[in-house]
Amino acid sequence: MKLFAVFLLFCLVNQIYCRRSRSNTVEVTKKCKSGGKDTSMEKVEVEVSGSFYPTLELPDYCTHRRLDDDKCSKFCEHNCNPPFKRGVCGVWGDSQAGNCYCHT
């Protein structure tokens, strides 16, 4: 009976840990508009903890020239997955150039 109780406790702890681990990652799809077409890139999982928000790195061929804030923000918003709704884009001259920051 004790062995069975230990087994149940182990299963419960394992379930809570696994569920928590899964909820701490968000899948982000890297994309870039090229010649009016969406070119899909690989999907990446980014860990989310505390005030850290996932960054969406733009492919090199999207960052050769500075994107204006409006276009860049729209690009980021389009690529932010729930629960992240809004995107802020780092621009050249900024240490975060070429990254989209997704936030709620």
UniProtKB/Swiss-Prot annotation:
GO terms for cellular component: extracellular region. A motif (Putative integrin attachment site) lies at residues 92-94. Disulfide bonds join 32-80, 62-89, 72-100, 76-102. It is found in: Secreted. It comes from the Eukaryota. Residues 1-18 form the signal peptide. Keywords: Cell adhesion impairing toxin, Disulfide bond, Secreted, Signal, Toxin. Inhibits proliferation, adhesion and migration of host cells as well as host angiogenesis by blocking host integrin alpha-V/beta-3 (ITGAV:ITGB3). Interacts with host integrin alpha-V/beta-3 (ITGAV:ITGB3). This is Salivary protein FS145. It comes from Xenopsylla cheopis.
